[in-house]
């Protein structure tokens, strides 16, 4: 991986990340392709939208169709025909959240499949083996995620395990690269610690001392804590993260969350929000959210957003989308998802331009002014 900082403004960073499959300009939002596809869209749609990197989910792909099958097709790129970069998470979050009785121990996580109830065990090495099969460009390590709020003792245990597993993972990755496995794949560690400054500092320092990691993520946020608490935690944590490596905030979030955390030095984001909200009738626009289900749009000839240049806005009216949603037409999911993802990707493009022009404050102010009208 190549990484360079192209410019900064008010704490916000514009960077370039080069992987084996694409050049990624930051700040970057990564659409979530849980099953190897962004819901309702295919590889061509994502290319038309200009996506340079999307997320794949190790837990789901491990269970179905299985990483060995995907490997036969040349990894995720060959299987999905999306030629640009993939980031795959470790699957730890899904093992934690989807299994009724997941049990972490010192060596990994035992969980039951949400599909058929079969028992499985993730370890720092096994999740990397799965990601080697997937041939993703950026692999996330297994981390010990805890629900918030929680006891100090449990959060301390989470940090200790995550650090231990990170060391196991990076050692294993270096060994595998010596064998010619995963030579072009990059590996990120995940900082934990809840919303405690003391714990976040401890986790960040322990992980960031492991210099062989290609980047670092902030995990365990956007799980119900107030927004201001999330922003404070990110601002506190980034100061302990290296400036010369990518910074990734996992599972975040709303357009406002992205703007606030870009200002706090974050480079990379992912969230299911644009596609999930699209399917539920909520569309993102330059002036805020629009609920296409409302009767007021039944005969509205305007596009979703007059300032938007996406395929949906260039071709279809609010009235048509209102009709498709009410009729439960599958086409609605595609057109709405195209719009919402375009909105997110374009917001990141505008943010980058503002950073490079060193007028972040003006950009951020205008972002909020338009949404308050």
From Swiss-Prot:
Reaction catalyzed: 7-aminomethyl-7-carbaguanine + guanosine(34) in tRNA = 7-aminomethyl-7-carbaguanosine(34) in tRNA + guanine
Record bears the keyword Nucleotidyltransferase: no
One GO BP annotation of this record: tRNA-guanine transglycosylation
Pfam families: TGT
Keyword terms of this UniProt record: Glycosyltransferase, Metal-binding, Queuosine biosynthesis, Transferase, tRNA processing, Zinc
Cofactor(s) demanded: Zn(2+)
Region (RNA binding) location: 251-257, 275-279
EC numbers for this chain: 2.4.2.29
Binding site for Zn(2+): 308, 310, 313, 339
Subunit composition and interactions: Homodimer. Within each dimer, one monomer is responsible for RNA recognition and catalysis, while the other monomer binds to the replacement base PreQ1.
Record-linked HAMAP family: Q_tRNA_Tgt (MF_00168)
Known function: Catalyzes the base-exchange of a guanine (G) residue with the queuine precursor 7-aminomethyl-7-deazaguanine (PreQ1) at position 34 (anticodon wobble position) in tRNAs with GU(N) anticodons (tRNA-Asp, -Asn, -His and -Tyr). Catalysis occurs through a double-displacement mechanism. The nucleophile active site attacks the C1' of nucleotide 34 to detach the guanine base from the RNA, forming a covalent enzyme-RNA intermediate. The proton acceptor active site deprotonates the incoming PreQ1, allowing a nucleophilic attack on the C1' of the ribose to form the product.
Protein name: Queuine tRNA-ribosyltransferase
Source organism (scientific name): Aliarcobacter butzleri (strain RM4018)
């Amino acid at each position: 991986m190549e990484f360079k900082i192209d410019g900064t403004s008010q704490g916000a960073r514009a960077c370039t990340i080069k992987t084996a499959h694409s050049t990624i300009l930051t700040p970057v939002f990564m659409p979530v392709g849980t099953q190897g596809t962004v819901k309702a869209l295919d590889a061509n749609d994502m290319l038309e939208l200009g996506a340079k990197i999307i997320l794949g989910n190790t837990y789901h792909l491990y269970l179905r169709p299985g990483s060995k099958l995907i490997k036969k097709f040349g990894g995720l790129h060959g299987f999905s025909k999306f030629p640009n970069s993939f980031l795959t998470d470790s699957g730890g979050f899904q093992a934690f959240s989807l299994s009724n009785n997941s049990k972490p121990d010192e060596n990994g996580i035992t969980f039951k499949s949400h599909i058929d109830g079969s028992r499985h065990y993730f370890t720092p090495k096994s999740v990397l083996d799965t990601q080697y099969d997937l041939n993703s460009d950026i692999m996330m390590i297994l981390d010990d995620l805890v629900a918030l709020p929680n006891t100090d003792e449990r959060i301390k245990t989470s940090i200790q395990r995550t650090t231990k597993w990170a060391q196991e993972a990076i050692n294993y990755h270096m060994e595998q690269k010596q064998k010619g496995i995963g030579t072009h794949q990059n590996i990120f560690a995940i900082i934990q610690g809840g919303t405690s400054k003391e714990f976040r500092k401890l986790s960040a320092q322990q992980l960031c001392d492991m210099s062989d990691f290609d980047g670092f993520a902030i995990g365990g946020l956007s799980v119900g804590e107030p927004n201001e608490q999330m922003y404070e935690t990110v601002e506190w944590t980034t100061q302990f993260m290296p400036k010369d490596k990518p910074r990734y905030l996992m599972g975040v979030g709303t357009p406002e969350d992205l703007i606030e955390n870009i200002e706090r030095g974050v480079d990379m984001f992912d969230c299911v929000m644009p596609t999930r909200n699209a399917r539920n009738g909520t569309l993102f626009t330059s002036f805020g959210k629009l609920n296409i289900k409302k009767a007021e749009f039944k005969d509205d000839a305007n596009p979703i957003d007059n300032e938007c240049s996406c395929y949906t806005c260039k071709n279809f009216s609010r009235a048509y989308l209102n009709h498709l949603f009410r009729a439960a037409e599958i086409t609605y999911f595609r057109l709405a998802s195209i719009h919402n993802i375009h909105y997110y990707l374009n917001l990141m493009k505008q943010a980058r331009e503002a950073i490079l022009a060193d007028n972040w404050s003006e950009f951020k102010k205008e972002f909020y002014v338009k949404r308050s009208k």
